[in-house]
UniProtKB/Swiss-Prot annotation:
Polar residues compositional bias, start-end: 252-266
Protein name: Outer dense fiber protein 4
GO cellular component annotations of the record: membrane; motile cilium; outer dense fiber
Residues with Phosphoserine modification: 28
Protein function: Component of the outer dense fibers (ODF) of spermatozoa which could be involved in sperm tail structure, sperm movement and general organization of cellular cytoskeleton.
PANTHER family reported in the protein's UniProt record: EPITHELIAL MEMBRANE PROTEIN-RELATED, OUTER DENSE FIBER PROTEIN 4
Species of origin: Mus musculus
Keyword field contains Disulfide bond: no
Keywords (A to Z) from UniProt: Developmental protein, Differentiation, Membrane, Phosphoprotein, Spermatogenesis, Transmembrane, Transmembrane helix
């Protein structure tokens, strides 16, 4: 009976160890998943807020830069009178200073007074719409940057609908910037076709595409945080790691353990059956004595 008891005890010890290991793995995976999910959400929030800050600073660079066009590199494909050429240069210079540039010095060209600004709206209506969209983009960019930096304050870390509002602001900002970047070259191409000239676009315009990419990335990160994609990704990875880390012994269900115990108990009985024929009494031998 001693070997039978030893086998039963060893089987019970194995099952208890497997159960303890399963419970330990489940309990250890939950805090890790929670920490990883929260860290991913917080890192995405930090990246989105810093991207919005960089994009807003680049918008300010676009506002104060004067390199939207290169008037010195413009080429006339036909000759104009001197007064017409001067007027064309004035228009090109006003477009090269940007969409929100306001000159207050005395060295500014004569097109900066109110009458000539009205003429600019009548001659370049697309340029005027681009000014409006760029002005709205500046204001909305400031609001978005401020909104994405609010979670740094401890009292505002759990605001309702924070991710949803961030998504709406980001994609509205992307729409306004894309409209500005689309209307500015369209206005220039119309003017080039009308005056039969060619003017190269400056580096200030191409900064706008970098701003567009940054704000689009902010919108994607806000969308991922709002839809809890990080928790879904971490839950799927933890399930895969848990299934791969479990051994074949831990996959045996508890209902199968009694049958294994019964088989272990029956095996010694089967070993004891062949010992019974040794105890059979031999028949009496015939007496050979006289």
């Amino acid at each position: 009976m001693e070997p039978d008891l030893n086998e039963e005890e060893s089987e019970r010890i194995r099952t208890s160890r497997n159960r303890r290991s399963l419970e330990h793995r489940r309990n250890s995976l939950l805090p890790f998943q929670w920490k990883a999910t929260n860290n991913s959400r917080w890192m995405a929030q930090v990246v989105a807020s810093e991207f919005s800050l960089v994009a807003f600073l680049l918008l300010l660079v676009m506002v104060f830069s004067k390199k939207w066009l290169y008037p010195s590199k413009s080429r006339f494909h036909q000759r104009y009178p001197q007064n017409v050429t001067k007027r064309v240069y004035t228009s090109i210079h006003s477009m090269s200073t940007g969409l929100l540039y306001i000159c207050v010095s005395k060295s500014c060209p004569s097109s900066d007074n109110g009458e000539d600004n009205f003429k600019m709206w009548t001659i370049h209506p697309v340029f005027g719409v681009a000014k409006i969209s760029f002005t709205l983009a500046i204001g909305l960019g400031f609001v978005l940057t401020t909104w994405l930096h609010l979670p740094y304050l401890p009292c505002l870390q759990r605001m309702p609908f924070f991710g949803l509002i961030g998504i709406i602001l980001s994609f509205c900002e992307v729409t306004l910037i894309f409209l500005t970047l689309l209307l500015f070259p369209v206005n220039l191409w119309i003017y080039e076709l009308r005056k039969n000239i060619s003017v190269p676009i400056g580096w200030s315009y191409f900064i706008g595409w970098l701003v567009l990419i940054l704000y689009f990335t902010c919108g994607i990160l806000c969308y991922l945080n709002h839809k809890n994609y990080w928790s879904l990704i971490m839950s799927s990875t933890t399930i895969n790691t848990a299934c791969s880390s479990l051994g074949p012994e831990s996959l045996v269900s508890p209902s199968q353990t009694p049958s294994s115990q019964e088989n272990s108990q029956e095996s010694p009985k089967d070993d004891q059956k062949p010992s019974s024929p040794d105890k059979v009494v031999s028949p009496p031998q015939p007496d050979t004595t006289g």
